[in-house]
Amino acid sequence: MTNQSTIDKLIEMRLTAMADAFRIQMDDPTMKEVPFEDRFGMLVDIEYSNRKNNRLKRLIRQAEFEQPDASIAAIDYQSGRKLNKALISRLATCEYITEYRNIFITGATGSGKTYMACAFGMEACKHYYTVRYVRLPDLLLDLQAARDSGTFSTVLKKYTKPVVLIIDEWLLLKLTEAEARNLFELIHKIRKKSSTIFCSQFRESEWYQQICGGESTLADAIMDRITYDSYKIDIESIDPSKDLSMREVYGLDPAMAK
């Protein structure tokens, strides 16, 4: 069997990284002195790393992060915000995912909620968990459209399948009865089967009022399913008069680019 035939078969089996590495080995005279087991191990390592990297890129792309460059390592703890660094570091290990626990991130507009949620999502991707980011307004529209078209169960799977679901702009506007009902179906399906990261401008104590004015039993049903055993991060301002928004800190504010 010729070397080219071997390369062609590797490519046919979609072992392209291994094929490229094998070609490089064949062109390198010094590799003739390397034992076969070592050379073969090098080829396997290259193919393995390539597949891992491609898988990570695919997970990040499919997550549709609002801020795909977010990083736990880049979180600014000196920006006038009170942050629990120990808790953030613990959550970055993704242990909460294996425990099926949720994360609540609350804070004012521009406090860095979305950035932090996406940073947690990125860490989940690095652990090869599936993640999906969605704004609650878009989620509600998607669920209602599916309800109207008779495809609710199919669309619901789009949000129940990921191991980590990030819901941004959580309860920014009060829910109608129909919206709360659709949302309850989702929350009920993913409870203790996956983890959800909620980002909200409102404190947890105010969420009841945002769900049908707190009058519907759906408010109790939803809150009961998401609050138990959840981790809570409240991004508090130490000195509002000196604060920069996190959009400015991370260079995400279009006005800063002018």
Language-model features: locations:
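Post-Walker A helix-loop "phosphate-sensing" segment adjacent to the P-loop in P-loop NTPases
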Residues: 121-134
